[in-house]
Amino acid sequence: RFIYLPKIGEQIKKARNLFNKAIKYYNYKGSYQYCYCTKCNHFYHVINEALKHNVNLETSSSFDIDLILKLYQEKKIDKSLIVIHNGYKTEDYLQKIILLRDLGFKNTITILDSTDELNRLEKVLGRKKLQIGLRMAIDEESQSAYYTSRLGIRPNEIIHFFNKRIKSKKNLELKMLHFFVDSGIKDSLYYWGEFQKALKLYIHLKKQCDTLDSFDLGGGFP
């Protein structure tokens, strides 16, 4: 398999340029953070190349956390790195997420794909605070090759779920709303319709949660 490493940097720059143009045009006061998703290609030399472009990371399995620990040992990343934990949370994955927190990685955010994941997370959570995000379920296009709308919490359930299960917990802090469409970022009425729903949900959720400050836009470029 051949991998053209300069292409990685080109795509990172492309994303940053597009967001920076939009930020300037709309006078947006927030910031944009690029997170390289390790499941796209978890080869060591590929992630090394991505890190040269000052990226943060997104994991999808416990094996990815092993890689993060190796990169830290080699002083290629530090504990201020933003690490988003996505994907199905096996027991081993959850244990390693907690390990990173306990080692002092201060910007890790665990995305909950379902209400059940919170039940399993709480069994290993301990007393230290953990930053979390919630994945919003979407109304998937019927022709989608990979039906992923089973993942996430229905928009009309998220605020109730936060108020009932998260808000009063001293060891949980909601930081992020995660939005992902399997077809990726593309200019279509369907995509922008779902995106608008997510933004409206973020606004309503922010009114209930002061610590919410991040919107995770998942999906690659077409």
List the model feature ranges, each with a label.
Residues 1-29, 37:
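Low-complexity, highly charged intrinsically disordered N-terminal segments
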Residues 33-214:
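Active-site-proximal beta-alpha core segment in soluble small-molecule metabolic enzymes
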Residues 213-222:
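Flexible glycine/acidic-rich beta-alpha junction loops that bind and position SAM and/or redox cofactors
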Residues 1-3, 152, 222:
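Generic, ordered loop/turn and secondary-structure boundary motif
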